[in-house]
């Protein structure tokens, strides 16, 4: 009976050095999407990603095992195809990848055609903007949004461990924030105010969370923020997520210590929990990234 595993489970078991558990895996079942598919006429190789881990797992399909007809069918599976795969789990310590799956059966769960726009090459951000529904399948966006997920968890974990109360502040508000340009929420009839008064998309939860600070002492809000500055540059964000802590009975030194502790905690958390994503960013986006982050961790803020 095949044992269902995710790619993350396999790599984490390998990374933890748990050879006994890996050796115990013989027959395995995987589900995922084709990243690449190539063959030499008798043996083929599929890079499969199941969405649980940044790295792919290699599938090896053999004409002698599958038969001519099945081999030919599998060899035509395109990038983006969804597969259910069963096979033998094999450790390959001498190869580039630590393990692979020798396919014994493979089912096509979802097909794509020749027009599928993502191929084995780097695509520009401008091109990917035209196919936004497929961007999460690219390495860059996959890494970015996995990182955002992990970093959000780190932020909450840091403040919760410090005893802070998480406050949900409203997105729709009648309060302006520090003179920032704000988006107005209206109906089709602009003279008929939706709430009978001026209503805005929040530029900050600060005003709301300050009142909670005077009841709970240490609080924070972490959520979407909107700014309507007239800028269409690539570096301008009209919507982003912002952390806003408020602490009572504190001075500037307390504020700075909180910021420093939060920054270092989040960096450590990301480096530990997004190792492959951070390697990708360091190799293909900013080759100084890991050096700079480690510099922050290892250098006092007074001289960093």
Where are the language model's segments positioned?
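Class II aminoacyl-tRNA synthetase catalytic cores and aaRS-like
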Residues: 1-304
